[in-house]
């Protein structure tokens, strides 16, 4: 068996009566402890650190310390022949014994030291007492003869640190009840500790030594951390653990993707499928195996397994968010609320800028009487009808862009609102500008035509427009009220809006402006129910719009003149059926 021996300095002669009993202490029968090392890990051989790592720079005197540990891979017992302690340890014990003596001051402590061995009759192995110094009480055996050297004080002693401490180990089911444990204490050269102890023999223990973590490396024994816990094997991850595996195919996975721990391959497959809205078909029974080797065989089953394990489609960024990691779609801009005065002023300005001035009206084509012609419309009349409609569309578009808050809407919503309300705005603006009593129709480009000049192109629709113009002008609506009414025609809920909430907010602002303006503009006779009468014109406009669509449809069937693309698009988009 290997023998590990460490000796520091020379044996110094202690001052006092303790000198007489040094041979007894050096006796090989000083202590015999029987301990069973049932754990193969404890019985394994190990290398312990040299005492020079602890005692560098020490200038005091030392005693000898020798111990032997068997190096057998089999379970063995450590007996007195295999574990022998010779001599004393660095420092002196006598200075501390006065502190640990009982209050009774037993005379037994004054007797010389003689520890019986297992071969002596006075030795009782099962009832081994406790041995402590400055940190506990020491009771060797019931025979206290020759123990006086424990009570003798040594003068001019040098207190040193404890290099090994023995304590009661925590119970471990994998280890023997009394394994050996050697714990290195902190080795510091810049301070000296007083009242240090050397050994503490545990009570209720046949051996008195706690567990030795012999499986630890020498570097661990050199550390300043006391190895107070019993040896326990390090936890290792079981091969069957699913941690770090892809939940879809079982490949290696380092982190979570879309809510589930998946590999990079399944992450990319799931992302591409969701972004492209791909549809897969299983050629088998929709139960194809999906693993690392066969995950590319059936895309349908692979995607279904992605959904089953919990991958979330909503987390995948869409095409509009590519390259914008960590950024969410910006919140839609709310319509900036302005004061009613500012809003109504902007509406009036937009209306005035979109109508021809009285000094620029074009009467070159105006004729009160026309020669008798056939009731059948001609291509010239139809072309004139289309030109008036398409010319009004561009004027109305420019007018709508000047409405405060309209340009803040999405471009798609602007086009949808304009095309849906075009015919209604054409009728309303024509009815407000015209002079129905004189039979004059003033169009937005400044052209003035008589009613008889428009009958063959507009048909009966023109009569309905003139009748509506009569009823509208009898209400004596001022320009601010009419400007608000025109804005309400285009700013209203339509099917297919992307942001109907913003349209609704702008509509509410316009209605509030109209409510605040009407009481100050109308006289007392016209003030009651004026707002309801004014808003009641909106359903009439819807009816007139339907008649206009019917007229366009009729002219398309006649096929005398093909309609302009913009008129044809508006017709097809605004059909109620």
From Swiss-Prot:
A zinc finger (NR C4-type) spans 246-266, 282-311. Transmembrane segments: none annotated. GO terms for biological process: cellular response to corticotropin-releasing hormone stimulus; detection of lipopolysaccharide; inflammatory response; non-canonical inflammasome complex assembly; positive regulation of transcription by RNA polymerase II; regulation of transcription by RNA polymerase II. It is found in: Nucleus; Cytoplasm, Cytosol. Residues 243-318 bind DNA. Gene3D superfamilies: Erythroid Transcription Factor GATA-1, subunit A, Retinoid X Receptor. One of its GO terms (molecular function) is zinc ion binding. Its cofactor is Zn(2+). The NR LBD domain may bind the lipid A moiety of lipopolysaccharide (LPS) in the cytosol. This is Nuclear receptor subfamily 4 group A member 1. It comes from Xenopus laevis. The lineage of its organism: Eukaryota, Metazoa, Chordata, Craniata, Vertebrata.
């Amino acid at each position: 068996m290997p023998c590990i021996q460490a000796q520091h300095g020379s044996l110094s002669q202690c001052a006092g009566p303790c000198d007489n009993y040094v041979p007894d202490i050096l006796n090989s029968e000083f202590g015999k402890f029987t301990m069973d090392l049932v754990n193969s890990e404890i019985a394994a051989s190990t290398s312990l650190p040299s005492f020079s790592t602890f005692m560098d720079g020490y200038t005091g005197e030392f005693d000898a310390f020798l111990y032997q540990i068997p190096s057998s891979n089999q379970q063995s017992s450590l007996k007195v022949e295999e574990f022998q302690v010779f001599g004393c340890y660095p420092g002196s014990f006598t200075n501390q014994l006065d502190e640990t003596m009982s209050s009774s001051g037993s005379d037994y402590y004054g007797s010389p030291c003689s520890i019986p061995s297992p071969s002596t009759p006075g030795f009782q192995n099962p009832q081994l007492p406790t041995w402590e110094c400055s940190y506990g009480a020491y009771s060797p055996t019931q025979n206290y003869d020759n123990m006086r050297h424990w009570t003798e004080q040594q003068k001019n002693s040098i207190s040193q640190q404890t290099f090994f401490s023995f304590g009661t180990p925590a119970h471990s089911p994998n280890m023997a009840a009394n394994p050996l444990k050697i714990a290195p204490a902190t080795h510091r050269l810049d301070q000296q500790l007083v009242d240090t102890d050397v050994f503490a023999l545990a009570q209720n223990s046949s051996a008195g030594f706690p567990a030795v973590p012999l499986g630890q490396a020498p570097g661990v024994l050199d550390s300043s951390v006391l190895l107070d816990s019993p040896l326990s094997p390090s936890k290792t991850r079981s091969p069957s653990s699913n941690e770090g595996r892809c939940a879809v195919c079982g490949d290696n996975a380092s982190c979570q993707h879309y809510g589930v721990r998946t590999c990079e391959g399944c992450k990319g497959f799931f992302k591409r499928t969701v972004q492209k809205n791909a549809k897969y078909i299983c050629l088998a029974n929709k139960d194809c195996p999906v693993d690392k080797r066969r995950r590319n065989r059936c895309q349908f089953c692979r995607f279904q397994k992605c959904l089953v394990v919990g991958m979330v489609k909503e987390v995948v960024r869409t095409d509009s968010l590519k390259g914008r990691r960590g950024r969410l779609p910006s919140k839609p801009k709310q319509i900036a609320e302005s004061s009613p005065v500012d809003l109504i002023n902007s509406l009036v300005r937009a209306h005035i800028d979109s109508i021809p001035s009285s000094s620029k009206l074009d009467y070159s084509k105006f004729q009160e009487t026309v020669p008798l012609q056939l009731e059948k419309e001609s291509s010239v009349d139809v072309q004139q009808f289309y030109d008036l409609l398409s010319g009004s569309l561009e004027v109305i578009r420019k007018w709508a862009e000047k409405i405060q808050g309209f340009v803040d809407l999405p471009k798609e919503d602007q086009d949808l609102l304009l095309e849906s309300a075009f015919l209604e705005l054409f009728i309303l603006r024509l009815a407000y500008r015209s002079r129905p009593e004189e039979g004059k129709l003033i169009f937005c480009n400044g052209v003035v035509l008589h009613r008889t000049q428009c009958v063959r192109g507009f048909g009966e629709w023109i009569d309905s427009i003139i009748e509506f113009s009569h009823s509208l002008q009898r209400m004596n609506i001022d320009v601010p009220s009419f400007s608000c009414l025109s804005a309400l025609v285009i700013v209203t809920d339509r099917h297919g809006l992307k942001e109907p909430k913003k349209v609704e907010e702008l509509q509410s602002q316009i209605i509030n402006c109209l409510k605040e303006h009407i009481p100050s503009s109308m006289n007392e006779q016209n003030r009651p129910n004026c707002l309801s009468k004014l808003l009641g014109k909106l359903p009439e406009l819807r009816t007139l719009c339907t008649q206009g669509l019917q007229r366009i449809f009729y002219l398309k069937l006649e096929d005398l003149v093909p309609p302009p693309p913009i008129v044809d698009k508006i017709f097809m988009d605004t059909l109620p059926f």
